[in-house]
UniProtKB/Swiss-Prot annotation:
Role according to the record: Cleaved by the protease thrombin to yield monomers which, together with fibrinogen alpha (FGA) and fibrinogen gamma (FGG), polymerize to form an insoluble fibrin matrix. Fibrin has a major function in hemostasis as one of the primary components of blood clots. In addition, functions during the early stages of wound repair to stabilize the lesion and guide cell migration during re-epithelialization. Was originally thought to be essential for platelet aggregation, based on in vitro studies using anticoagulated blood.
Start-end of Acidic residues biased regions: 1-11
Localization annotation: Secreted
Domain of life of the native organism: Eukaryota
Residues modified as Sulfotyrosine: 6
The protein's name in its UniProt record: Fibrinogen beta chain
Keyword check for Nucleotide-binding: no
Record text about domains: A long coiled coil structure formed by 3 polypeptide chains connects the central nodule to the C-terminal domains (distal nodules). The long C-terminal ends of the alpha chains fold back, contributing a fourth strand to the coiled coil structure.
Modified residues (Pyrrolidone carboxylic acid): 1
Residue ranges, compositional bias (Basic and acidic residues): 12-21
Length: 21
């Protein structure tokens, strides 16, 4: 489970942020 919170719609963007790291 991710420590950060995000909307289901933002799920894809959140994953992209993780890859960006």
């Amino acid at each position: 489970q991710p420590s950060y919170d995000y909307d289901e719609e933002e799920d894809d963007r959140a994953k992209l942020r993780l890859d960006a790291r």
